[in-house]
């Protein structure tokens, strides 16, 4: 019998990353949530047309929404649908997760930020970070540590030659 070929997609499941969030915030916890999307948005995400660098998550009436996320519509998108690239999108989470997030935001003074957008099978998921803002001196120490690690690696590489 002939063996079946396994279907593997080329590339990564990641659609968009928010590198700025890791620089601006201390990420305490990461949570996965689904997104309520329209058809043209899914097609645009398959092409990788998303930007979440300015996005944030807020709670209203016991539900979570992401704002500031831009999904650029495709050129060949339908003409009868008006595409709003920056619309507020609802996050799909369980009631227990929503209550937990709401409590952490209110009690501990945390904020919610979008960290990454990715495919999980055929569903689009967003990774949310429960975060606390960094002060300027914290950002500077992080940069110094990164520079030192880079310099250390460079010295070790040259020493091994």
Swiss-Prot record:
Which CDD domains has this protein been placed in? Answer: SmpB
Protein family (similarity comment): Belongs to the SmpB family.
Query: Where is it mainly found?
Result: cytoplasm
PROSITE patterns in the record: SSRP (PS01317)
The keyword Cytoplasm appears for this protein: yes
Q: Which UniProt keywords apply?
A: Cytoplasm, RNA-binding
Gene that this polypeptide is encoded by: smpB
- Provide the protein name: SsrA-binding protein
What are the GO BP annotations of this UniProt entry? Answer: trans-translation
Per the entry, what this protein does is: Required for rescue of stalled ribosomes mediated by trans-translation. Binds to transfer-messenger RNA (tmRNA), required for stable association of tmRNA with ribosomes. tmRNA and SmpB together mimic tRNA shape, replacing the anticodon stem-loop with SmpB. tmRNA is encoded by the ssrA gene; the 2 termini fold to resemble tRNA(Ala) and it encodes a 'tag peptide', a short internal open reading frame. During trans-translation Ala-aminoacylated tmRNA acts like a tRNA, entering the A-site of stalled ribosomes, displacing the stalled mRNA.
The protein's location, in the record's own words, is: Cytoplasm
Superkingdom of this protein's organism: Bacteria
UniProt GO molecular function: RNA binding
Which InterPro entries does the protein's record reference? SmpB (IPR023620), SsrA-bd_prot (IPR000037), SsrA-bd_prot_CS (IPR020081)
The cellular component terms of Gene Ontology attached to this UniProt record, alphabetical and capped at eight, are: cytosol
Pfam families in UniProt:
SmpB
Q: Which residues form a coiled coil?
A: none
């Amino acid at each position: 019998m002939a063996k079946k070929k396994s279907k593997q997609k080329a590339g990564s499941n990641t659609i968009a990353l928010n590198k700025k969030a890791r620089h601006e915030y201390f990420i305490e916890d990461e949570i996965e949530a689904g997104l309520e999307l329209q058809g043209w948005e899914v097609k645009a995400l398959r092409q990788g047309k998303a930007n979440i660098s300015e996005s944030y998550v807020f709670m209203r009436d016991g539900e979570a929404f992401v704002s500031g996320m831009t999904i650029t519509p495709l050129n060949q998108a339908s003409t009868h649908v008006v595409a709003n690239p920056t619309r507020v999108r609802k996050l799909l989470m369980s009631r227990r997760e929503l209550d937990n997030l709401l409590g952490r935001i209110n009690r501990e003074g945390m904020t919610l930020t979008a960290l990454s957008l990715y495919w999980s099978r055929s569903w689009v998921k967003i990774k949310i970070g429960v975060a606390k803002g960094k002060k300027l001196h914290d950002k500077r120490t992080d940069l110094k540590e990164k520079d030192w690690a880079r310099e250390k690696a460079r010295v070790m590489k040259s020493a091994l030659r």
